[in-house]
């Protein structure tokens, strides 16, 4: 057990990497509309111009500070648990990366099909990837507590429902 605990100090590498890239790109895109439109998920352009990179890049930019903070706080709150659990279960970092990027990609597929003929539809944010991490955590420990607004302990399943409501409101 001591080896497992000592090894956990470095478990956040992907969390910090994803958060760092997302924060930096989001801040740049807050003031650079051209880059924002180049990275955003626009199904019409994705299909017509074969710009499939957009299925991933849109997950690293956000509309505003609130959008960025909610997604990154949620990811940070649940990411460590999933990264540790996956390593403990022998899945390793590859499974964690697959979960994150898989969530991002799968969440985009519906809009890719439904909105492929709409040149004005634009989607951004890491909600698909964050939802994959969040709901994997809830699946593994539905009653685990998270400090909502850093003070109110709520079960993960309740936080998940609140996060879904927020995502729906922002959509």
For each of these PLM feature ranges, what is it?
Residues 1-171:
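A detector for small-residue-rich transmembrane helices and their helix-helix packing motifs
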């Amino acid at each position: 057990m001591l080896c497992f605990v000592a090894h956990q100090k470095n478990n956040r590498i992907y969390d910090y990497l994803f958060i760092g890239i997302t924060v930096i790109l989001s801040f740049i895109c807050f003031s650079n509309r051209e880059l924002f439109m180049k990275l955003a998920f626009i199904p019409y352009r994705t299909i017509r111009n074969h710009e499939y990179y957009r299925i991933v890049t849109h997950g690293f930019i956000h509309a505003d500070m609130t959008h960025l903070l909610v997604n990154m706080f949620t990811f940070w709150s649940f990411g460590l648990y999933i990264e540790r659990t996956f390593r403990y279960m022998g899945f390793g970092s590859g499974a964690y990366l697959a979960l994150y990027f898989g969530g991002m990609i799968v969440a985009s597929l519906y809009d890719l099909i439904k909105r492929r003929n709409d040149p004005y539809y634009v989607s951004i944010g890491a909600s698909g990837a964050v939802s994959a991490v969040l709901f994997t955590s809830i699946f593994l420990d539905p009653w685990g507590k998270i400090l909502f607004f850093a003070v109110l302990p709520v079960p993960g399943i309740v936080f998940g429902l609140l996060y879904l409501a927020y995502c729906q409101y922002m959509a």
